[in-house]
Amino acid sequence: MTEYVAGKYDVIVIGAGHAGCEAALASARLGAKTLILTISWDNVALMPCNPAIGGPAKGHLVREIDALGGQMGLTIDKTCIQIRLLNTGKGPAVHALRAQADKKRYQREMIRVLEHQENLDVRQAMVESVVVEQGRVRGIRTNTGAFFAAPALVITTGTYLRGRIIIGDLHYPGGPNGYFPSVALAASLRDIGVRLGRFKTGTPARVDGRTVDFSQMVEQPGDREPLNFSFLSPRIERKQISCWLTYTTEETHQIIRDNLHRSPLYAGVIEGTGPRYCPSIEDKVVRFADKKSHQVFIEPEGEGTHEMYVQGMSTSLPEDVQVTMLRSIIGMKDVKIIRPGYAIEYDYVDPTQLRLSLEHQEIGGLFTAGQINGTSGYEEAAAQGLMAGINAARFVKGEEPLVLKRSDAYIGVLIDDLVTKGTNEPYRMLTSRAEYRLLLRQDNADQRLTEIGRSIGLVDDRRYRRFREKMQLLEQEVVRWKSSFVTPGNKKIQAILDEKKSAPLTKGVSLYDLLRRPELTYDDLIPLCNDGEKDLPIDPEVAEQVEISAKFEGYLVKQQAQVDRFNKLENKRLPADLDYKRVHGLSNEGRQKLIARKPVSIGQASRISGVSPADISILLVYLEQQRRLAPGEGGVD
């Protein structure tokens, strides 16, 4: 086939899923001439699994993407059909937004944003090879002979790399939702020295909502006063569509047990490792044999369709078994399948080959983001895509990469876990993975990250102005509460305390200090603030942050002290050219891991599996010796 030069760019993004969209938009918005390529322009921002954005830890990621100037939060706010705040019975660290998406509208809106973005070209093409010369990216080739030149490349191919669809005895090469897999590109990555592994994920059947008996299920409506993912979005006032909760039965489980011999998962057909936190229904029935039922959520796929997603029933069982199994669920005895569930195997890049910037350690200008890095979930993908797009643009400009620490954001935790620790199964973001989760709440993502987004040029004037206005309101509100006092003789406060079964006052106290009591809320006390100035236009999120800062002040101070100690180790930098073979006393395993991972700091080195506390002590002594031998050169503060 005749090759021709089809174009020259600063950054090329391969794949237009959730990672690719964020990467391309970030790169273009930072001024880099960018091209995004996808197998099909119809699969842009596709949701091949659940029709939802957010949830525990994932909602935090979406808020952080938005605070930095990313797109996902804005798009889901415009296209959601339901939104709920989860975990409200727990502390604020784990409060999380989750939205049901109209999948097609979400795609159309993201396509509109991409097509109208300055500095961004879009192209439908099958990329077959990555061109690397002298250890640096030079461009890519497509199956039609087009060569696109660029010094930076972001690969966001999701589950398409050598994808294989599996439904019972049927298995064939394919990507999600019937799209083509990317086979030649996987071979090209191996040829240039990228280490690949094999993972598996799956999805449940989609069913016709007209054949579901919702009267036998429990309705799950959206919040009456829904919050937004984006700090820029107006309040959501559109009509919401409910989800429905039902359960499997003992009959369901018996059907599955009777057909385990036909399950690819248990017949040895599936080679890839599956996700721990999203197991198939057959896996759940085997692992939790004592459970008589499992929750099943019926979720609408959009406003103008009868297609419903059966959350909790991911499977690769044969289609005839899927039909029988689904019809044994409460309220689904007459259900009809629109699309069967399936498993998909795919290649992924071992993320320990990457720097914290998501650039490959050995191939300059090669970035990867999303499920190709071993993660699961749209939100994890989008977060990586944003950071890879930012750093690809900065790479082209010769600027230092943007790296968020574990104490900065869930995004920092996500990337540090992948690069430093690696993963042997599809990685899912969890609040429990974040050591400093009380500081990394979803409500304060803008306070943590918008200034960073502004400093690199991704946060525009409108967003920054809105952020500064909110910060000013918050400061004023805290001052107002700290300067408003009540005394034991105040009948209004006594009535409130009696109603809330709170201890009476014994001395004068500010309303801010009174708000520390767990049984009292902002809304309870606002009528007393400055003689009842309750009509001030206070943003509900500002009110929430005032309450959190009062109630959790002691814990926040303690956690900040932990962060300060953490940052001391993070700030002890390890030279990029450090020869660990010359550092005497390191354990053999520790030396091997340090050579392979190339940590940038003592803090990162301490999180590598196989590097012991003794190894860290030896590194600290070595760095101090080097500092004394060469004062002012490569020293450690």
Swiss-Prot record:
Its main location: cytoplasm. SUPFAM superfamilies: FAD/NAD(P)-binding domain. One of its GO terms (biological process) is tRNA methylation. FAD binds at residues 15-20, 127, 182, 371. GO terms for cellular component: cytosol. It holds the Pfam family SAM_GIDA_C. NAD(+) binds at residues 274-288. One of its GO terms (molecular function) is flavin adenine dinucleotide binding. It is found in: Cytoplasm. It comes from the Bacteria. Its cofactor is FAD. InterPro entries: FAD/NAD-bd_sf (IPR036188), GIDA_C_N (IPR049312), MnmG (IPR004416), MnmG-rel (IPR002218), MnmG-rel_CS (IPR020595), MnmG_C (IPR026904), MnmG_C_subdom (IPR047001), MnmG_C_subdom_sf (IPR044920). Keywords: Cytoplasm, FAD, Flavoprotein, NAD, tRNA processing. HAMAP family: MnmG_GidA. NAD-binding protein involved in the addition of a carboxymethylaminomethyl (cmnm) group at the wobble position (U34) of certain tRNAs, forming tRNA-cmnm(5)s(2)U34. Homodimer. Heterotetramer of two MnmE and two MnmG subunits. Belongs to the MnmG family. This is tRNA uridine 5-carboxymethylaminomethyl modification enzyme MnmG. It comes from Heliobacterium modesticaldum (strain ATCC 51547 / Ice1).
